[in-house]
Amino acid sequence: MKILLNKGGGNIENPGVISLWLGNFKSKEVLQKYVEIQFDEQGDRIPSQFMRDFQIDFINYNEDLLEITFIDISTTSLQLLLEGASYYEKIISQFIDYYGEHMLESYNTVIRVYDFEYNEANAVENKHLVYAGAVIYEEWEE
């Protein structure tokens, strides 16, 4: 299998696909705050900083399908970064096939959004995260 690179159109809800970001944060608390969705006085959702940074809206994004990992010591090892992820066995081989067992840089943070295919054309320069791609974790019959 290969990394899906959505280069056209917008971000899309895509059952069976996981989009992955790698990065570095000071602490798990800072990471949690970065992905946390707030509510205004009327109860309307306010996009998280993560959503704003990567131009993700609520139409195709379900925050219940987001997983984060923070490890204390940065690593280049994809196995260590993805350890404990849902569907680990399905996704690790695809990312290793694409990147190799080690990334070129060290990271301590992983953000995974399931059933969501990020449009790489929306990728922006970000001091905390890089978009690593999307892979299929579960086949769906139409």
Regions found by a protein language model. Give the residues of each.
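Short, extreme N-terminal segment that most often corresponds to the first beta-strand
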Residues: 2-40
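Low-complexity intrinsically disordered segments
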Residues: 43-142
